[in-house]
Curated annotation (Swiss-Prot):
NCBIfam families: murC. This is UDP-N-acetylmuramate--L-alanine ligase. Cell wall formation. The keyword Repeat does not apply. The gene is murC. It is an enzyme of class 6 (ligase). It comes from Salmonella arizonae (strain ATCC BAA-731 / CDC346-86 / RSK2980).
Length: 491
């Protein structure tokens, strides 16, 4: 970015000129890193801290950010403001030091709100589908030549980044309800994909509180703004009369303003027709599998249509959509001869879904696109509280696969809860008599345990939000082949 462009950006909010150095605590998270990346490209001095390097910190370092792989008071020295992830506790030494030095400490959504303040903001909220829908909206606007800024919670594979600074008035951002901080945002357009009971600790276990928070988020829209909402979702249908803003509904339902018809999945692609009020029908080829992704695309089309984007640009963007990292992410197809001596191959797919609804959607997409495959899932439950609260739902969903390997619960900082662990969940599933799950206590043994399960016509789903994505990449690197001790030492 040249000096003239930077001066123009800085002039949007003159008071932000007082801010020179922005420090992020927990900078390696995708949501934090995306905002840091946009601000780095706007010319701000960026620093941050996290526990270990990852692709996000590597990208930020390449942009000139200073990253500390520790949490120490001196890391916030000279910072104008400290941005904190919701995963960071109040007693973090950097947070304590910032308060003592009277440095403002804000949550990531508050900084995102500043980026959005004088732009045309499009915020994507909902329990499931936010990241993919954000990527789809961004792809359509980019294809139409509108050069948007976007900040996403996952890797936008076509761009190779989580966030990008554009030079137009549009800012497209994932809005996170997990800590209710999306209430800081004041967009012009808001998508709500669905609403389910998740992150209930934030909402004191009260689902009505969660629903009202979504209403409050939508009422942050100006009176001339627009809420785009999935009418297939029963909670959204219930809340629609309480939304005091202009609305566009979408879904498979007959009464949707933008309606999906004739959905068919062939391999990794969805094919369907979109019916829009007062507009020509669109015959869509979507390069992403599953009815849930057809809904995500329909939300993106509804927003783009309202903006007057050309239909050809919409169709091109969806047909060439490259997806987002860890969302039905195809990692390869590998011959089994070196793995277990069998002929045939196994496909490897990595997916972030960690709620029963998301896992169910991934399984359905796999079954629809590859109905003859032996469906093998490696599942890592995420958080003891989620496993406890949705225990029966997990047990019901996970019995739909042909073979199940389960890792221990990824705690995400939580302490174990009796009966909400992987061993208990495996026992419950086994007692239902459909499949016999295998508990994998040592992730280093996963390839050895997986090999005899594979038949020669397999689709392996690596599923979860913890560190299971690293296991998926490892399995891809070794091409599923169990490693000898010597191979591991030279790997």
């Amino acid at each position: 970015m040249n000096t003239q462009q930077l001066a123009k950006l800085r002039s949007i909010v003159p008071e932000m000129r007082r801010v020179r150095h922005i420090h992020f605590v927990g900078i390696g998270g995708a949501g934090m890193g995306g905002i840091a990346e946009v601000l780095a490209n706007e010319g701000y001095q960026i620093s941050g801290s996290d526990l270990a390097p990852n692709p996000v910190t590597q990208q930020l370092t390449s942009l000139g950010a200073t990253i500390f792989f520790n949490h120490r008071p001196e890391n916030v020295r000279d910072a104008s403001v400290v941005v904190v992830s919701s995963a960071i506790s109040a007693d973090n030494p950097e947070i304590v030091a910032a308060h003592e030095a009277r440095i403002p400490v804000i949550r990531r959504a508050e900084m995102l709100a500043e980026l959005m303040r004088f732009r045309h903001g499009i915020a994507i909220a909902g329990t499931h589908g936010k990241t993919t829908t954000t990527a789809m909206v961004s792809s359509i606007y980019a294809e139409a030549g509108l050069d948007p800024t976007f900040v996403n919670g996952g890797l936008v594979k076509a761009a190779g980044v989580h966030a990008r600074l554009g030079h137009s008035r549009y800012l497209i951002a994932e809005a996170d309800e997990s800590d209710a901080s999306f209430l800081h945002l004041q967009p012009m357009v808001a998508i709500v994909t669905n609403i389910e009971a998740d992150h209930m600790d934030t909402y004191h276990g009260d689902f009505e509180n969660l629903k009202q928070t979504f209403i409050n988020f939508l009422h942050n829209l100006p009176f001339y703004g627009r809420a785009v909402m999935c009418v297939d979702d029963p909670v959204i249908r219930e809340l629609l009369p309480r939304v005091g803003r202009q609305t566009t509904t979408y879904g498979f339902s007959d009464d949707a303003d933008v309606r999906v018809e004739d959905y068919q999945q062939i391999g990794p692609q969805g094919h369907f027709t979109l019916l829009r009020q007062g507009m020509p029908d669109l015959r869509v080829t979507l390069n992403a599998p599953g009815r849930h992704n057809a809904l995500n695309a329909t939300a993106a089309v509804a927003v783009a249509t309202e903006e007057g984007i050309d239909d050809d640009a919409i169709l091109r963007a969806l047909e060439s959509f490259q997806g987002t990292g860890r969302r039905f992410d195809f990692l390869g197809e590998f011959p089994l001869e070196p793995v277990n001596g069998k002929s045939g191959t196994a496909m490897l797919v990595d997916d972030y879904g960690h709620h029963p609804t998301e896992v169910d959607a991934t399984i359905k997409a796999a079954r629809a696109g590859w109905p003859d495959k032996n469906l093998v899932m490696l599942f890592q439950p995420h958080r003891y509280t989620r496993t406890r609260d949705l225990y029966d739902d997990f047990a019901n969903v996970l019995t739909q696969v042909d073979a199940l390997l389960m890792l221990d619960v990824y705690p995400a900082g939580e302490t174990p809860i009796p009966g909400a662990d992987s061993r208990s969940l495996c026992r419950t599933i086994r007692n239902r008599g459909k499949i016999d799950p295998i508990l994998v206590s040592d992730p280093a043994q996963i390839a050895t345990i997986l090999a005899p399960v594979l038949t020669g016509n397999d689709l392996i789903l690596v599923q979860g939000a913890g560190n299971v994505g690293k296991i998926a990449r490892y399995l891809s690197e070794i091409k599923l082949k169990p490693q000898t001790q010597e191979e591991e030492q030279h790997g």
